[in-house]
């Protein structure tokens, strides 16, 4: 696995969604299915592991089956593991085809593919009268400690990027905003690690600032979204191409 903008995005989206919905147990079956797909294709796993990490966006299906099924513990574990392995196997097969739908203008291509899988799975589960009601567990406000930790972390990330950059690379920070962001837009490869880290910090600060400005809340889901934005600030996102969407 090479260090790239896409790998940074995959790792940060894993960390961000670990704040709401993902955990080790509901991700492992999906990664196992991803490994099985690599074996099926007779390829090395590192070719598909990034897709596997993104595929864990459907990890709640694993938890849902384990919690909801009215059967023995062993059968619930087996059903949850099988559905996770199925997800991990199917999404890598589907993702290359969904990329042609949007021609690189959707940076969340694996999530797009996973959406089709989720629709199919929910249709099947509802056919068996397995459905989940809406649940809202939401913390209000901007906790001072969490806000301080986030701002301190962003300052450290920006400073780290600055230290990693020479004079030429510092000029590339402005050049990042001239990229369209259309995939594949690997800022780590095109502009260097330092400018990419600084762009990630700027995007994180802007996201938190926007949440505060509109009276939003800083909690697991919103912080997960901020971390996801930071991850994709290494792979296509920058202030110039995100501002019009936020304004809309």
Model-flagged regions — what are they?
Residues 1-106, 111-248:
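Pore-lining transmembrane helices
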